[in-house]
Structures are given as C-alpha cells and as structure tokens.
Amino acid sequence: YGLTALLFLLFGFGLMLLMRWQLAYPEQALPVIGALFSESTMPGGVMLPEFYNQLGAMHGTIMVFLGVVPLAVGAFGNYVLPLQIGAQDMAFPKLNMLSYWCFFAGGVVMLVSFFVPGGAAQSGWTSYPPLADYATTGQTYWLIGMIFLITSSLLGSMNFIVTTIQLRVPGMSYFRMPIFVWAQLVTSFLLLLAFPPLEAAGVLQLMDRLAGTSFFLPSGLV
C-alpha cells in the first residue's frame, strides 16, 4: 500500500507541477514539456483548456483516492490498528490483499485513460451527471477506475470493523480503545454508509455510457 500510494502521489505531484507551470506562463509555449505532447493536447506547446481540465480532474482523483487515503488508511492503518488493540493481524488478510489489488487496478485503469482517444476525464474529479455522460472515452475509464477504488474501500472498511470488534485483547473495552482505533472504526462505518450509493451511481453512469440506458441522461427524463 505504502509504496504504491507514494508512486501515485509522485505522479499526481507531477500533474500539479505541469498545471502550475502553465498558469505561471499563460498562453505561452512550455519549453521541453510542450514538445512531449501531441498537437491535439498542446498545439505549439500551449496547453488547451480541455487538456488542463484533464490534468485537474486526474490530479484531484489521484492525490485523494490513490495517494493520501491509501497511505493513511491502507498502509498506516492496517499496520498500526492491530498493534494498538493487541491483535496479530487484521481479521481477513486475504480480504486485505483483494482490497489492495482493487486499489492498484483502479489506479492503473485511471492512468491508462490518458492514452485513449480524447484523453482522460474532463468533467472534474467529482464527475457530476449529466456532464459526465457526454465526456470522452477517458471518462469511461475514470468511472471504471473509481468503481474499483470504491470496492477497495468497502472491503477495507469491513476488515477494519471486524478486526476492531472481534480481535481486541481481553479486557480492552470500547472505552479503553485508543483514539486512533476509534477514528478508524467510525470512518469505516461512515464509508459503509456513503460509498454503496456512490458506487451504484458510478455503475449507472457506466450503463448510460455503454448500455444505452438513461438513468442520468436528460433525454430519458420525463
């Protein structure tokens, strides 16, 4: 978790530097960097607004969902929480690995979206419909990646809850648990409440894009 999250953080940091560089020199060609991108994204080395939106959407997603959260919860939390409650490991180590591979797969799918026709997601990292239904193919990849990441978070939340409830050392009541363990437990419960509707919305958006449904498309509203 830690090494993978750090790699994603470095990539997100690079996107941020590219955005700030263009903001520092508006309407000017970026030396060296501008030559590395195609004319469809940076004609003459000047960043198009659509490409800037792609960088903004992917930067926000990567830093939050692929960097900070996996580093703080997946890496630090999975290591520290069992130590603080006297457990040898998390309740479901294999579920932990499944959560990691969902996280890794989601991150890779998101990064691949930069190389598909039309580029990465442009509708913002919150991906509100109906704008998200009309974006490029990269938006589809972004949605698939988000579904993987949400699934990873749900699996991890279940693991944290069961570990905290079932594997506490004898004599440790809820009132004696460290504040960090309480924070992870409450956060896990909140994720179980908030993320299933979010994942369902992502699946419905995917169906609008790929299966011809109209859950969010204005044309399907009565």
Model-derived features with residue positions:
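Membrane-embedded and interfacial regions of multi-pass energy-transducing membrane proteins
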Residues: Y1-V222
